[in-house]
Every structure is written in structure tokens, then in C-alpha cells.
Regions:
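Conserved catalytic motifs of ABC-family nucleotide-binding domains
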Residues: 170
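The feature captures the beta-strand-to-loop junction immediately N-terminal to the Walker
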Residues: 44-46
């Protein structure tokens, strides 16, 4: 189970008042939610409403000003063990997939990043070629894409590769930040 409890996040405003100091813009105010195992949840909102910020809090990339994120009873921000618990159970597909895929890696290496996580967690070696082929086919791409580079794929195809990488480590939770916006 994943929980957010009374999450507050603010950022320094671009507009600064020289007399009274810096102002802060509240992005998330007292947000609480519980996502039970096996649940698929979509968060909808206008541009700039805090959806991506909430995603960054959920995946441990942004510590909130106050409040708590809890995964399976372990506070994400309270300890290194909490962050490790999160890293072992969560995978993310970013909105800007072009910067999340190393342009010098072949597709098999990009997906291999997720397979490395799975191998470490399970303590066993995988047949990487077979797993990469399976994952590419799972997201609707041919297995021979494994030898290509990101610049050789369309935006939608590269987005699918990023989804395959997220699935590769067999996470308990996959967080998508507008991850299907570029699929063809």
C-alpha cells in the first residue's frame, strides 16, 4: 500500500519581493491519498496543478516541505532503508522520455538497466537477450529493435522502450508522468 499523508510542497516564486524577501508558491497543500495494492490510479488536473510534483514526491525525487510518504508501512523519507524500500518496489516512466534514455546506449542497454535491478534484487542472472526480446514484444515493438539507438526510433517507439525498461525490473508500482502522451 502506498500512502501520502498531509503532503505540502512549495517552491520559491520566480517573482521576488526585494523589500519583504522571497515569496513561495504553494504547489501541493495538505494532499493525502491511499493507493491499495492492485489498484490503478489516474491523477487528472490542469497544467501546473501539481501532478508531476506529486509524482516526484511519490517516487522519492522530491522531499515535501511537510507530510509523509509511506510504502508498505515504511516511511520513504525517514531513513535510508525507506528510500531503498521505495527504489526496490517502484519504477517511473518520465514525461520527457528523450532525456531519460541515454543516446549512446543501444535499446538493449536501456532495457538492460531495468534488468540489472531485477538481477540484483533476485540474486540471479537473466538471459538478457531473451528478456529484452520479450519486453520489446510486450510493448508492441519487434525484437530486432534491441540493436538500434534511440535516435533511430520515433518518439512513440522510444516511449515504448522506456515503458519496457520500467516493466523490466518487475516493480510493485509503476508511476507514469504523462508517459503515454507520445505513443503512436
Amino acid at each position: 500500500m502506498l500512502e501520502l499523508k498531509n503532503i505540502n510542497v512549495s517552491f520559491r516564486s520566480e517573482r521576488q519581493d526585494k523589500i519583504f524577501g522571497h515569496t513561495r508558491q504553494q504547489v501541493l497543500f495538505d494532499v493525502s491519498l491511499t493507493v491499495k495494492d492492485g489498484t490503478c490510479l489516474g491523477i487528472l488536473g490542469e497544467s501546473g496543478s501539481g501532478k508531476s510534483t506529486m509524482g516526484r514526491v511519490l517516487c522519492g525525487l522530491l522531499k515535501p516541505d511537510s507530510g509523509e510518504a509511506v510504502l508498505d508501512g515504511v516511511s520513504v523519507y525517514a531513513s535510508r532503508a525507506g528510500r531503498r524500500n521505495l527504489q526496490n518496489k517502484l519504477s517511473i516512466v518520465f514525461q520527457d522520455y528523450t532525456t531519460s534514455a541515454n543516446p549512446r546506449f543501444r535499446i538493449q542497454d536501456i532495457i538492460g538497466e531495468g534488468l540489472t535491478v531485477q538481477e540484483r534484487r533476485e540474486g540471479k542472472k537473466l538471459d538478457r537477450k531473451a528478456e529484452t526480446s520479450r519486453l520489446l514484444e510486450l510493448v508492441g515493438l519487434p525484437a530486432d529493435f534491441a540493436d538500434r539507438f534511440p535516435h533511430e526510433l520515433s518518439g512513440g517507439q522510444l516511449q515504448r522502450v522506456c515503458i519496457a525498461r520500467a516493466v523490466a525490473c518487475k516493480p510493485k508500482i509503476i508511476l507514469f508522468d504523462e508517459a503515454i502522451s507520445s505513443l503512436d
